[in-house]
Swiss-Prot record:
Residue ranges that the Swiss-Prot or TrEMBL entry lists as coiled coil: none
Function of the protein: Catalyzes the interconversion between ADP-D-glycero-beta-D-manno-heptose and ADP-L-glycero-beta-D-manno-heptose via an epimerization at carbon 6 of the heptose.
Signal peptide: none
GO biological processes: ADP-L-glycero-beta-D-manno-heptose biosynthetic process; carbohydrate metabolic process
Cofactor(s) of this protein: NADP(+)
Name of this protein: ADP-L-glycero-D-manno-heptose-6-epimerase
Disulfide bridge partners, by residue number: none
Length: 331
């Protein structure tokens, strides 16, 4: 039975396609926009049955042109939190998602989609409840508005609808994202090219490099998606993070020590790296003041209650694995 992945050449979408392949699934229709042609590299080692441009997909799916479809993993979106074109953001993230969901409901197709922890914005509590949702940018609002519609639709839906509020995801196949790629990716490239890593200095009560995020490996993101794919009776909106906030210092230290280890050099503590000038703390940029999440940490209660019991990788585990993968890629 056919599976459809939108955003299939993007970061999370490509990893989901690869994860499905590893389970023997190859009847996969990949949907994306390859205006950025280099994104093809994300799925060059994947097996798919067809590729469609996103502009052609929704109407054809709504007409039932693809026969019996089991599920759609809807990962396609504009994920640039600095995007200021609100009309583009709402059309791409909200209107398009509505059309995909409605077609799924009409045909009884499982609908698993990407929401975001950006829906919480300035909140200090990260639980899937309306009182904690205060997005700081139009990206977060576009995701929240769709979540709000989903909450109403789920009351009467006869097929699965699952939204995943992704926290700070890192891992393979994100190189096309540019400035929106993970901190781990940028730290890796900066240390290799410059021999140092730059982190934000003190801001909003947090020490240098001490701003904390829930960094989650894309390996775990794929596992959670596939868990719900295997359990079509479970619907809801779920946080997808480790439940453990870690400072940016941990990312930088893990990246640098992995690269040092590859050169036969000993591991150093964060303090030692800073003392040797290998970590450089820079003034927090004025452009981000008031628009920046200094702390995120997923409340996993709802995810665990749904039956997902597997442990999540720590930054030290996941980032080291990611760096080892990056080291094997062609320069």
């Amino acid at each position: 039975m056919t599976i459809i992945v939108t955003g299939a050449a993007g970061f999370i979408g490509a990893n989901i396609v690869k994860g499905l392949n590893e389970r023997g699934e190859t009847d996969i229709i990949a949907v994306d926009n390859l205006t950025r042609a280099d994104k093809f590299k994300n799925i060059v080692d994947c097996q798919i049955s067809d590729y469609l441009d996103k502009t052609d997909f929704v109407e054809r799916f709504a007409r039932g042109e693809f026969g019996k479809v089991r599920a759609i993993f809807h990962e396609g979106a504009c994920s640039d939190t600095m995007e200021t074109d609100g009309r583009y953001m709402m059309d791409n993230n909200y209107r398009y998602s509505l059309a995909v969901m409605r077609a799924c409901l009409d045909q009884g197709v499982q609908f698993l989609y990407a929401s975001s922890a950006a829906t919480y914005g300035a909140s200090e509590t990260f639980r899937e409840e309306p009182e904690f949702e205060r997005p700081l940018n139009v990206y977060g609002y576009s995701k929240l508005l769709f979540d709000q519609v989903v909450r109403r639709v789920m009351l009467t839906a006869l097929s699965q609808i699952v939204g995943f509020r992704y926290f700070n995801v890192y891992g393979p196949r994100e190189q096309h994202k540019g400035r929106m790629a993970s901190v781990a990716f940028h730290n890796f490239n900066q240390f290799r090219s410059e021999g140092t890593v730059k982190l934000f200095g003190e801001y909003n009560g947090y020490p240098q490099g001490g701003q904390m995020r829930d960094f989650v490996s894309v390996e775990d993101v794929v596992k959670v998606n596939l868990f719900f794919f295997d359990n079509p009776d479970k619907s809801g909106i779920f946080n997808l993070g480790t439940g453990r906030a870690q400072p940016f210092n941990d990312i930088a230290t893990t990246v640098m020590n992995t690269l040092r280890g590859a050169e036969g050099k000993p591991a150093l503590s964060t303090e030692e790296l800073a003392q040797e000038g290998l970590i450089e703390y820079v003034k927090f940029p004025d452009a981000l003041r008031g628009k920046y999440q200094c702390f995120t940490q997923a409340d996993q209660s709802r995810l665990r209650a749904a039956g997902y019991t597997a442990p999540f990788l720590t930054v030290q585990e996941g980032v080291e694995r990611y760096c080892q993968w990056l080291l094997k890629q062609p320069v």
